[in-house]
């Protein structure tokens, strides 16, 4: 006899992500278990995003439909800007990221994969939870490295060589800052006991919103326009931080800067255009 109550219970607890997870395990298990996989995933995501935004930067001077969304419409991203930021990014990856990845590949055993996928609720809450924790960690790190002069000069001043943000500035970082960001991105899902699928999704989300913060554009689909009540900082607020380095320290959310008295509200792009005409 069919036990309808147990069948209903099993279906209700089966994750909608299970088919995807089953496919990934059946077809790409060896790749997913490799210690190199998170590194390749994150680097690939970053390169795709910066390629997209860099193409926009190069087209913007002659394409008004793109330029209208630039935060600083009177400035252009030059080949020199692209070359210098890309050179440091390449240097950091070759000198630090690649050797660390190879070391993990040599000495760390393959990662065991759970049979079951996370529930959709656990998946989404895990990403949100990791983002909240990372936001707090980097807010404190960022505030400290601006308030202590030696820390700023030694580790963080490099990132502020560019007052105009564009995508490649995202990882225009010292080795210490790059290590700090990578450490929290890796450890936070472990602290919250997230499924590995959730951890990888958080990693991709973190790279996406970090690059968006530095992209130099105020698009209608930007995170700060999607998250209600002004809770998300976004590209405008982070650009304001590069203009006024004593403000807007939190990387993603806005509440820590509100509570800490370090928040500043940038003018929207359209207001800037109108002000320029009036001037």
From Swiss-Prot:
| Sugar-modified residues | 6, 13
Renumbered to this chain, motif Histidine box-1 spans 141-145
Which sequence ranges are marked TM in the entry?
36-56, 86-106, 120-140, 165-185, 189-209
Q: Point out the coiled-coil segments of this chain.
A: none
Organism per entry: Danio rerio (Zebrafish)
Could you tell me the membrane topology recorded for this protein?
Multi-pass membrane protein
Taxonomy of origin reads:
Eukaryota, Metazoa, Chordata, Craniata, Vertebrata
For activity, the cofactor(s) needed are:
Fe cation
Task: Give residue numbers for sequence motif Histidine box-2.
Answer: 156-160
The Gene Ontology biological process annotation of the record reads: cholesterol metabolic process; sterol biosynthetic process
The EC designation for this entry is 1.14.99.-
**Key word Secreted present in the record?**
no
What PANTHER family does the record tag this protein with?
Answer: STEROL DESATURASE
Task: Name the principal localization, coarsely classed.
Answer: endoplasmic reticulum
Compartments in which it is found: Endoplasmic reticulum membrane
Which superkingdom heads the taxonomic lineage of this protein's source? Eukaryota
Q: Where is the motif named Histidine box-3 mapped on this chain?
A: 237-243
Q: Name one GO cellular component term.
A: endoplasmic reticulum membrane
Q: What does this protein do?
A: May catalyze the formation of 25-hydroxycholesterol from cholesterol.
Protein name, as recorded = Cholesterol 25-hydroxylase-like protein 2
What range(s) does the Fatty acid hydroxylase domain occupy? Answer: 128-262
């Amino acid at each position: 006899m069919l036990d309808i109550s147990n069948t209903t219970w099993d279906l209700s607890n089966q994750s909608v992500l299970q088919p995807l997870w089953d496919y990934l395990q059946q077809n790409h298990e060896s790749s997913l278990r490799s210690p190199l996989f998170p590194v390749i995933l994150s680097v690939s995501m970053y390169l795709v995003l910066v390629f997209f935004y860099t193409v926009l930067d190069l087209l913007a001077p002659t394409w008004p439909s793109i330029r209208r969304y630039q935060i600083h419409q009177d400035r252009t991203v030059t080949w020199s800007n692209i070359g210098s930021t890309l050179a440091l990014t390449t240097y950091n990856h070759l000198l630090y990221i690649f050797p660390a990845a190879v070391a993990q590949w040599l000495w760390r055993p393959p990662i065991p994969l759970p049979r079951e996928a996370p529930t959709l609720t656990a998946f989404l809450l895990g990403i949100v939870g990791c983002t909240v924790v990372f936001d707090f960690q980097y807010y404190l790190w960022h505030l400290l490295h601006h308030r202590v002069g030696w820390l700023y000069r030694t580790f963080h001043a490099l990132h502020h060589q560019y007052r105009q943000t564009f995508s490649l500035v995202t990882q225009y970082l010292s080795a210490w800052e790059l290590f700090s960001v990578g450490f929290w991105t890796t450890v936070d899902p472990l602290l919250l006991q997230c499924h590995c699928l959730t951890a990888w999704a958080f990693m991709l989300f973190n790279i996406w919103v970090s690059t968006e913060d530095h992209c130099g554009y105020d698009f209608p689909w930007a995170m700060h326009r999607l998250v209600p009540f002004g809770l998300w900082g976004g590209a405008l607020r982070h650009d304001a931080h590069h203009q006024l380095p004593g403000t807007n320290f939190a990387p993603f959310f806005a509440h820590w800067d509100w509570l800490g008295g370090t928040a500043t509200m940038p003018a929207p792009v359209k207001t800037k255009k109108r002000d320029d005409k009036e001037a």
